[in-house]
């Protein structure tokens, strides 16, 4: 329990992607789709971002509500490396917070942001700026923490003050795969989107990307749709076009 909210947390198996290559990947993906969690806390290893952020891009394509916990942040600091997580948050368009779970560092902030996401707080406006009311709330909430016992001031100070100065972060952003792939994704997505009943549960962009990757699990699902034959025809056509243009498959 935190700030009057009761959290039901499901710890899913660790995975670096949402492909269909391992049982863990399939299980995690199906859980997200079938159980539709209110908010996803995407815990990444701060010292191995390149490997971890691929999963983040896939979660973005799934259109889930998400906050990224940059965990084991103390080890990154101890190594002498630095991370501009303010910029990283802007580039991905999702809140990213440094945490050290073993020391309870940053966890209060993390769950406060989770509550805001759950309540449907609009973190970003149409221009990609962070909502000033959200900034005000985070700043005031952080200031109230300074009087709490054993509060680690640095765990939010830098994050909130930085945003207070700049007042800008980018909105939830899908990774652009380049003109050829994006054209293929859009073509498949247009046909998939004709099935309005699936929109509340599936991201049509995510389904389209996975179809172009020949994901067997997603293809099996798509074959149950009324226009499955046309979807797969367009997928095959666009996949061939990408292969001919880029000399590699999707």
Model-predicted regions and their roles:
Residues 1-7, 23-97:
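Conserved C-terminal guanine-recognition region of P-loop GTPase G domains, centered on the G4
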Residues 13-22, 73:
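Flexible beta-alpha connector loops of hexameric P-loop NTPases
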Residues 15, 46-49, 101-104:
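Short, surface-exposed acidic/glycine-rich loop or hinge patches that mediate macromolecular interfaces
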Residues 22-24, 111-112:
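Surface-exposed beta-strand edges and their flanking turn/coil or helix-capping segments
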Residues 67, 77-250:
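Alpha-helical transmembrane helix bundles of large polytopic membrane transport and channel proteins
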């Amino acid at each position: 329990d935190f700030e009057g909210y009761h959290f039901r947390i499901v710890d899913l198996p660790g995975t670096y992607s949402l492909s269909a290559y391992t049982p863990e990947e399939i299980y995690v993906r199906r859980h997200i789709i079938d159980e539709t969690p209110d908010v996803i806390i995407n815990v990444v290893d701060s010292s191995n971002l390149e490997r971890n952020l691929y999963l983040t891009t896939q979660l973005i394509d799934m259109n889930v509500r998400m906050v990224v916990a940059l965990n084991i942040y103390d080890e990154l600091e101890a190594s002498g490396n630095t991370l501009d997580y303010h910029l990283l948050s802007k580039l991905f368009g999702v809140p990213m917070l440094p945490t050290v779970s073993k020391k309870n560092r940053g966890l209060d902030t993390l769950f406060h942001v989770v509550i805001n996401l759950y309540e449907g707080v609009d973190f970003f406006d149409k221009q990609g700026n962070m909502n000033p009311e959200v900034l005000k709330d985070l700043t005031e909430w952080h200031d109230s923490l300074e009087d709490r016992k054993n509060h680690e001031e640095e765990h939010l100070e830098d994050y909130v003050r930085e945003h207070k100065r700049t007042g800008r972060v980018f909105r939830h952003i899908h990774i652009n795969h380049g003109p050829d792939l994006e054209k293929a994704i859009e073509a498949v997505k247009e046909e998939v989107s004709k099935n309005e009943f699936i929109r509340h549960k599936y991201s049509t962009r995510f389904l389209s990307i996975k179809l172009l990757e020949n994901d067997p699990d997603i293809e099996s699902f798509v074959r149950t749709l009324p226009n499955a034959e046309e979807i797969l025809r367009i997928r095959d056509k666009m996949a061939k076009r990408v292969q001919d243009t880029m000399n590699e498959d999707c």
